[in-house]
Amino acid sequence: ATANVGLASDIIAFPGMDYCNLATSRSIPIAQGIAERMKELGTEREVGDLKIKISGCVNACGHHHVGHIGILGLDRAGAENYQITLGGDGTESAALGERTGPGFPAGEVVGTVERLIGAYLELRSDEGETFLKTYRRVGMQPFKAALYADLAGGGAPEL
């Protein structure tokens, strides 16, 4: 086993629909997909301290709202859809994450997180600047641009 405490693959994910009757989406497969992709990319140590938290419904048992990257699974017209929040912090500098905009279908979440991490690596001021510090310095807009670049017009939607 490889130690991953504090790395992108050290994800807190409430089990979601796999084990909870209140949940509206699955969290375990999303967490597994993200962890596997981060290991494939081999950038976990470069990324460093990153708290990814996933909840399977609005009850927020996975504490997505205080994840540096938070993922909230919802039911949208019978399909699992995942909202992304950024900038949450559960430490003494507590902050609730901000929604990035429209959610993503289950099959796009891993790529979404990968785009966020790629944006972070490009935006950070140096190797020692964490995801959360980078987010606080540059704000939401550059991350939204990375997430929603494929939409018409090439930019992020306004909320």
Regions from the PLM with identified roles:
Residues 20-28, 99-106, 133:
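Hydrophobic alpha-helical scaffolding
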Residues 67-125:
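Mobile "lid/hinge" segments at catalytic clefts and subdomain interfaces of large enzymes
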